[in-house]
Amino acid sequence: MRTLIAFEEARQIVLDAARVVGPEAVRLGDAVGRTLAAPVTSRDDLPPFDTSAMDGWAVRLGDVRDLPAVLPVVATVHAGEVPAATLAPGTAIAVMTGAPLPSGTEAVAPVEWGTASEGRLRLDRAPEAGQFIRRRGEALREGEEVLPSGTAVTPGAIGLLASLGVHEVAVRRRPRVAVVATGDELVGVDEAPGPGQIRDANGPGLAAQVAAAGGAVVGTLVARDTSASVSAALAACTEADVLVFAGGVSMGERDLVRTELERRGVTWSFWKVAQRPGKPLAFGVLDGRPVLGLPGNPVSAAVCFEVYARPLLSACLGHADPLPHSEAGRLDAALPTAAGLHTFARVTARRDESGVLRLRPAGAQGSHVARSLLDSDGLAHLPASWDAAEAGAEVTFQRWAW
């Protein structure tokens, strides 16, 4: 097992261990936030017929060449109706937005360009050929790929798929994640801590991060600092695709997670990463399942989850690019660095008048300052090679995905 490896290498090792989960079929209305397991192709042309883009009149170009043009209005077509007749030369047909256009229509003149009274239309402006006509198949052709596999289903995608008659989609099932917080000092959130005890923040916090990342929590467990308790927690994780531990992977005599996992045959890839916060981070594979050992400090655990576990779950869901979105930003104030350690600084972000993303420290940067997770917009990545991070320095900014 390697120790104190670089952040970039550690993250790639985690991603390389991801196994894409299987598919399941869900109703369209339940697919928001899920990931497509297969491409979706259009069953029809969209729109399915030539339609009017405006309220107005269907006309032939030769009839409106000389202005003002005066034409009899011989019919009206509303959305949902079928034109009863062809547009004959020398006539106009009133059409509403979305209405099918009668055969013979060469353009639509919007209502703002003319007036109609007692069945006669006067046009003071002529449309160009095809103007204000939405052609059949203009948006999508039958058989055309609408959304590729690996796409996250958004509300906008739901509307598009509904318009194509898609009522059920194949999505990746949610990766099953077991979250285990460790420590004799932990009590439940509904309990009053006794002397030397604290409420468990890691279990509920990490479970929420799993859900926000598209996973399904199959257990939120607390393991005491005994081999028997850690063993019992591991035995309860058999259904999980991914195991996430908070605490128990450091060098203390009661950090028993590593020992118990090794007894069960885990293959460790690394232990300790050259980063801050989250230096005591461990990763391995047990029976083909990724095992991520996070620090016990809640801030360090939350940060490491976003940097490592969220991309891992995205890869398990089959996302083409599982890495979190990042962008360039500029520091408005100096930030502390640590020699040889990649630093994740909690920062606020705002754009100035010129469009530059300005980053400022979100208060104290200690790994015990849980409030900084709420007060910040994301993480500024300060490379391990930097001796200092001065105001004005350009850095990579990773916005919180929650």
Q: Locations of the language-model features?
A:
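Short, glycine/charged-enriched hinge/interface segments at domain edges or termini
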Residues: R2-E8, I13, A18, P23-A25, ...
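An N-cap/entry alpha-helix motif that binds or orients negatively charged groups
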Residues: D16-S52
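Short, basic and Ser/Thr-rich N-terminal targeting/leader segments
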Residues: R34-L36, S42, S52-D55, P89, ...
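Helix-rich terminal scaffold detector
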Residues: T3-F7, H167-L294, P298-C304, A315
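Alpha-helical scaffold segments in soluble metabolic enzymes
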Residues: E9, I13-D16, D30, R34, ...
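Flexible glycine/proline-rich
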Residues: E24-G29, A38, T51, G80, ...
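Short, conserved secondary-structure segments in the cores of folded domains
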Residues: L36, P48-F49, V73, P83, ...
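A short glycine/serine-rich beta->alpha loop
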Residues: R43-D45, V77-V82, P295
